[in-house]
From Swiss-Prot:
Any one cellular-component term (Gene Ontology): host cell nucleus
Record's function text: Component of the helicase/primase complex. Unwinds the DNA at the replication forks and generates single-stranded DNA for both leading and lagging strand synthesis. The primase synthesizes short RNA primers on the lagging strand that the polymerase elongates using dNTPs. Possesses helicase-like motifs and therefore may act as the helicase subunit of the complex.
InterPro entries associated with the record: DNA_helicase_dom (IPR003840), HSV_HELI (IPR034711), P-loop_NTPase (IPR027417)
Protein name: DNA replication helicase
Binding site residues for ATP: G90, N91, A92, G93, S94, G95, K96, S97
Similarity annotation: Belongs to the herpesviridae helicase family.
Length: 881
């Protein structure tokens, strides 16, 4: 029986440890032993990648060119597009992502995700050990673009005449089904080849140089990506890894293979010349995921969402594909839930995952999680838990109930506020849409209601507590503006629904948490190689502005006076020692700058007298009379050692060279670490857990609105869908870089002008590390595809946020939610949805549900479960425990 311990890439880089008996850390051997079960996967994928096919089986470029001339797609000539598949499946937390990390480190491959969330999850995993290149979705890699979102899938159909169908039949069916997207990609790729754009001639140039230098063919092809950074990733490798592949429809498999051959044929890459074929490594769980397809019926103004066969189920269950891919020899199954530390709960999840027989013991275990639905739906119960529902309607109803509860309770910490969102509809485009769809009487109001899920992120538009839509017509601008208010909860947990720009402006946490940030360099690592200097400069700015917090802490009257006096002396000595020889600031200017940099524990700007405590020195002998001259006040404070000498001894600047930036950061870090050590020794946890906050400028929170004078010195970054944020409020502060980004979008001119005039507020979020950011608004264009016409119908402006207080079970997939309360719908129970909902938590102690689904009637994925159980008994399938 094969056993495996998943690869732990977080093993210490410095293996030698003199404190252990043999001088080495024993844990490193455990990490090495894990390779014996992962190694066969690597070896098999390498074998598949090295296979070459005869020249007559290599798809010719002329075949792709013929497709551009077709009038009726079903008449296209059948042609095999050779490929291999390796399948990696398993239940939640079994080690699939760790296996992807090993593949990335051991094989030159293209790592992708089925969705942006999946891609960002993979990137987060890969970045734990080494700096990782950005991970894109599989759609981005094969050439899918924004104008394809509204493409009409299934407009054409192909029906084979033989049973069972051949692999050529299956591929032709998928190409015809996905015709509008694939033919548009084909046109664009051929145009690039004709124009010489995108480095299409790079490989041909290298072939010519090789012949001139009498080098072996292909010996210089490895330099292609150095010479031209715009080469498609598909021309670099023939191993393509897709995480969460179960979310993709079956036609995407053929789309990936089609585009791989198309791009390599156009570029004449070495792998095309040598007859290599693509190896699609599909990672995911076929029993817990569903692929959904949406078709919008324009005549009915209704979106029709239907489940479709996903890639994993397609590969496993289709007999033709099973034989073509030899799936039994190219399948690895991970069957251990390492996230769950409870044996009974872990066994229950495995039973649900693989469709094993459900026993009375399983049902009794689930009985312990059941509470009344009214208990879950009462916002006063289970604070901090995430509610999961079957439908968006239930989510929206709970959010409305929660907001009403918070308004009545008058909770200052979790107060509610509303912000406007806008939709700008082009009148001329809307009139053209009505003509093309034969609906002259269609109103804008009805169109907005019917298309809200397409205009905005679907779950975002359905889950929010939204107000009444108000319409304004601006005929002179050719626009109708629809405005609606969305209610948010202050200090609640949220996620972003798309990648948004953010400007990091500060930090709010504790002295200990900020020391941890500086110690492990996680903040700098997350910036990537191109932004490290900016990260160091930003941290230096924060440290310099936040050093006054150490002196603010010493103002606490509950501290022992002797220890406070000693702290002042040691802080002054440390500062003089570290800053000797640095540029000094003028004394009076130092006081002003220091006061401006000071931030008290509540995040508000500290006044000069409070920041330096000129009149509140412990055991001060100067109590009867206070000098009125500012310089006399400062010298008095110097004598009492209560002034922060950093602002006297050091003039903060913004260095330009890398060495100066890094040197400044090391100096600021040394001051912070030194002060932290002094006060931690004297005051222990009362200091380390005390609030610490620092911003690039003075800030103040007026209810839910953040007021800040200047954002200069902020750090530009991305808000990712995989991160969890705390909603701190909103701000109207101008952010120049966001204004520039709006200008670059090249929206309809009148829409842009109205956006400037409306002055849309920006959200303020805090990430899990404590960094506070201003997040750009989510501005999206909506283009409708009708027949062969593309209409720029609307522009939407919202905040791209979705609450973690409640969501649908479908949207929770891939998220770790810790504390979960589930409301199932008794008449629509599916076992895979039950598994997804229950597996979001790592402990059964934090799981509640309104009913026991194992005692109700439910739908079971019998066919796929039978195939997986058969695979577990198949000696050719590689099983990893």
């Amino acid at each position: 029986m094969k056993r495996s311990i998943s690869v732990d890439s977080s093993s210490p880089k410095n293996v030698f440890n003199p404190e252990t008996p043999n001088g080495f850390d024993d844990s490193v051997y455990l990490n090495f032993t894990s390779m014996h079960s992962i190694q066969p996967i690597l070896s098999r994928i390498r074998e598949l990648a090295a296979i070459t096919i005869p020249k007559e089986r290599v798809p010719r470029l002329c075949w792709f060119k013929q497709l551009l001339e077709l009038q009726a797609p079903p008449e296209m000539q059948r042609n095999e597009l050779p490929f291999s598949v390796y399948l990696i499946s398993g239940n939640a937390g079994s080690g699939k992502s760790t296996c992807i990390q090993t593949l990335n480190e051991a094989i030159d491959c293209i790592i992708t995700g089925s969705t942006r969330v999946a891609a960002q999850n993979v990137h987060a995993k890969l970045s734990t050990a080494y700096a990782s290149r950005p991970i894109n979705t599989i759609f981005h890699e094969f050439g899918f673009r924004g104008n394809h979102i509204q493409a009409q899938l299934g407009r054409y159909a192909y029906n084979w005449t033989t049973t069972p169908p051949s692999i050529e039949d299956l591929q032709k069916r998928d190409i015809v089904y996905y015709w509008e997207v694939l033919i548009d990609i084909t046109k664009r790729v051929f145009q690039m080849g004709d124009d010489g754009r995108g480095g299409t001639s790079t490989f041909k140039t290298l072939w010519a140089i090789e012949r001139l230098l009498n080098k072996p063919t292909g010996s210089m092809s490895g330099t292609a990506f150095i010479a031209c950074g715009s080469l498609p990733a598909f021309t670099r490798s023939n191993v393509i890894v897709i995480d969460e592949a179960g979310l993709l429809g079956r036609h995407i498999l053929t789309a990936v293979v089609y585009c791989w051959w198309l791009l390599n044929a156009i570029y004449q890459s070495p792998q095309y010349i040598n007859g290599r074929k693509p190896v699609i490594v599909c990672v995911g769980s076929p029993t817990q995921t569903d692929s959904l397809e949406s078709h919008f019926q324009h005549d009915m103004q209704r979106s029709h969402v239907t489940p479709s066969e996903n890639i994993l189920t397609y590969i496993i269950c289709n007999q033709t594909l099973r034989q073509y891919t030899n799936i039994s020899h190219n399948w690895a199954i991970f069957i251990n839930n390492k996230r769950c530390q409870e044996d009974d709960f872990g066994n229950l999840l495995k039973t649900l995952e693989y469709g094993l027989p459900i026993t009375e013991a399983h049902a009794r275990l689930v009985d312990t999680f059941v509470v009344p639905a009214s208990y879950i739906n009462n916002p006063a119960n289970l604070p901090g838990w995430t509610r999961l529902y079957s439908s968006h309607k239930e989510v929206s109803a709970y959010m409305s109930k929660l907001h009403a509860h918070l308004k009545l309770s008058k909770n200052d910490h979790f107060s509610v506020f509303a912000l406007p969102t806008y939709t700008f509809i082009r009148l001329t485009a809307f009139d053209e849409y009505r003509k093309l769809t034969g609906q002259p009487g269609l109103s804008v109001e009805h169109w907005i209601r019917a298309n809200s899920g397409r205009l905005h992120n679907y779950s975002q538009s359905r889950d929010h507590d939204m107000g009444t839509v108000k319409y304004e017509t601006h005929s002179n601008r050719d626009l109708i503006v629809a405005r609606t208010d969305i209610t948010y909860v202050l200090n609640s947990l949220v996620v972003v629904t798309t990648r948004l720009r953010k400007l990091v402006i500060g930090f709010s946490g504790t002295f200990q948490s900020f020391a941890k940030v500086l110690r492990d360099d996680s903040f700098v690592k997350a910036r990537g190689e191109t932004s490290i200097e900016y990260a160091y400069r930003f941290l230096s700015n924060l440290i310099f502005g936040g050093l006054i917090n150490f002196y603010n802490f010493l103002l606490n009257k509950n501290l022992h006076p002797d220890k406070v006096s000693l702290a002042y002396k040691r802080l002054a000595a440390l500062t003089l020692e570290l800053l000797s020889g640095t540029n000094k600031a003028p004394l009076h200017e130092a006081a002003v700058n220091g006061a401006g940099a000071g931030i008290d524990c509540d995040g508000a700007a500290t006044s000069a007298d409070k920041a330096f405590c000129f009149t509140k020195a412990p055991e001060s002998k100067v109590t009867a009379s206070i000098p009125e001259d500012p310089d006399d006040v400062i010298f008095t404070a110097l004598n009492d050692e209560v002034i922060d000498l950093v602002y006297c001894q050091y003039e903060f600047s913004y260095p330009k060279s890398s060495n100066e930036v890094h040197a400044q950061f090391l100096l600021m870090k040394a001051i912070y670490d030194g002060r932290y050590a002094i006060l931690a020794e004297l005051f222990e946890s009362s200091f380390t857990t005390a609030p610490f906050s620092a911003y690039v400028d003075n800030v103040n929170f007026n209810g839910s609105e953040l007021l800040i004078g200047n954002v200069r010195g902020g750090l530009l970054s991305l808000a990712l869908q995989t991160d969890t944020y705390t909603l701190l409020g909103y701000t109207f502060a101008p952010v120049p870089v966001f204004v520039e980004e709006l200008t670059r979008k090249k929206l309809y001119r009148e829409t842009t002008e109205m956006l400037y005039a409306l002055h849309v507020p920006l959200m303020v979020l805090q990430d899990q590390h404590g960094f506070v950011s201003i997040v750009n608004a989510n501005v999206c264009e909506f283009t409708e595809s009708i027949e062969d016409a593309e209409l720029a119908m609307a522009t939407t402006v919202d905040y791209g946020l979705s609450s973690k207080l409640a969501m649908t079970i479908a949207r929770s997939q891939g998220l770790s939610l810790e504390k979960v309360a589930i409301c199932f719908t008794a008449d629509k129970l599916r076992l895979n949805s039950v598994y997804v909902a229950m597996s979001r938590t790592v402990s059964s102690r934090f799981l509640k549900m309104n009913l026991n689904p194992l005692r109700e009637r439910y739908e079971k994925s019998a066919e796929i479960s039978d195939h997986i159980l058969a695979a577990l008994r198949d000696p050719n399938v590689h099983v990893v425990y």
